[in-house]
Amino acid sequence: MLKKLIIFFGVLMILGCGYKPVSVLTKEIIAEKVYVDVVIKKSDPANSVAIKDGFREAVIKRLNRDLSSQSDADTVIIANIANVVFVPTSFDRFGFVNAYEAQVSIDYKVKLSSGEPLNIIATGKSYFRMNRQVLDTIYTDSVITNQDRYNAIFEASKESFDELIAKLALKGYKLKKD
């Protein structure tokens, strides 16, 4: 009985404070049919593919929107990779890197369903470890594998997209309030 009472008051507090999920707030701005694309950098096409995969997954899973062709889309989001950096964050006792932080900055050009263009820069980070040391031997392989690199950029791009959605949700909240 006490558990039900606590759950009831918890739900009442959340509803009473005006909480709305991001997908509801962005519904005002981002239409059901969304076209997404990532401008592929010729100097680093592998990063572009990882970002494009993370970007598309985030639109489908986080916004519950359908991907469509550019001609059928009501909302268009074009991502341009501004910067991808791997920063060493941890070293083993021999001085070799064993953890990195991937930092991804993406310049989003968004055409809203209202036709209004927006330019938003968002960043994302992803941490990963490289534990390849065996017992007390010095193992100098602190090289980032292609799979580690892809996964880190993929996760960082999803975090960047979350920042974009948060900024769009804030804009949607302001529009609804006015």
What are these regions (language model features)?
Residues 78-147:
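Surface-exposed short loop/turn segments
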Residues 1-2:
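N-terminal secretory signal peptides that target proteins for export/translocation
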Residues 45-54, 97, 101, 143, ...:
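Soluble non-cytosolic domains of exported or imported proteins
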